[in-house]
Structure formats: structure tokens, C-alpha cells
Amino acid sequence: VKTVLKDMLSRRLLRIKVVKALFAHLKSGADNMIASEKTLMTSVDKAYDLYFQILILPVEIARYAEQRQELAKQKKLPTHEDLNPNTKFVDNQIIRVIANSDAVNDYAAARKLNWTRYPELIRTLYTQLTESDYFKDYMARPERSFADDRKLLEDFFKELQSCEPLDNVLEEMSILWSDDLPYIV
């Protein structure tokens, strides 16, 4: 999986990490380059983790949306919309590919990456997503296409770059992630 990921992290992010590690090594005055290399590799590994953590985020939001749809069907007096929800987002082809990817699932499980401790963030991001114009346009289109599914996720990831609740949670998860998010999404 890591060999595939090397292509997924931007060269710019890797260069920044190398420069920061080199600067830290020179400032420390240490002669031991091995410790500095280990610090650099830890930083790069954490960037891989962030990549996967962000990659599984739309999957968790889609699961939350699906749970909401199932709960709505169980109301005492469900509406027509409750009984026949628009499942376009839940059935997003790209989200399904990510959710069913053994490579993604294996890496996330091995590194214990998930969003289970942050249901309030998932709820907040779901609300922000469903209130956005690009989501409303996506859901209103009668046809389903891979290009539309991709565009929805592109817009969602762009929006994540300035999402304060996400920044706070990511910083809580790992202090090394606070500066990397713009380069990952």
C-alpha cells in the first residue's frame, strides 16, 4: 500500500517535510542524522495516515446519511420522501469504491484510522454538505454519472480546507496533521 501512496502524496508536501526536518536537524546541532531521518519518516507516515483518514471521511458521512434514511422510514407517520429517499449520495460510485477497497480498509484497520470517536463531527459535516449549493444541485440531477459523483467529492474536499471543526478534530488526533491538510485534500 505504501508504494502506491508515495504517488498520492504531493511532491510539494514531501519537499516541505524534508526542509522542515533539515532545518530542525541543523537547529538542534545534533550529529546524529539517524534520529532526524526517523523524525522525517514519522512525519511522512503521519501524512499517509491523514490521507487515509480524509479518504474514509465521505464513507462515514454516507453511512450516517444512510442511517438517517433508515430511521426516517421507521417513523410512525413517514412521508413519501421518508419512504422513498433520494439515495444518490448514499450510492455515490466513488464512495462505494472507497468503502469496498481492501487496500483502504486494511490500511485504516492496521493504523486504527476511523471516525467513531467523532460522531458530532460527522453530523456537522453532513449538515454542511446537505446545505451546500453544490450538494443540492447534485441531488437534483435526475441522472447518475461517475463524473457527477467525482465532482461532488472534489467540491466537498475543497470545502474541507476551511472547515474549523475538522481542523480542531484533526489537531486533536495528531499534532502533525494541522499543517498537512491543505496538501492532502
Each PLM stretch: what is its role?
Residues V1-V185:
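Class I Rossmann-like S-adenosyl-L-methionine
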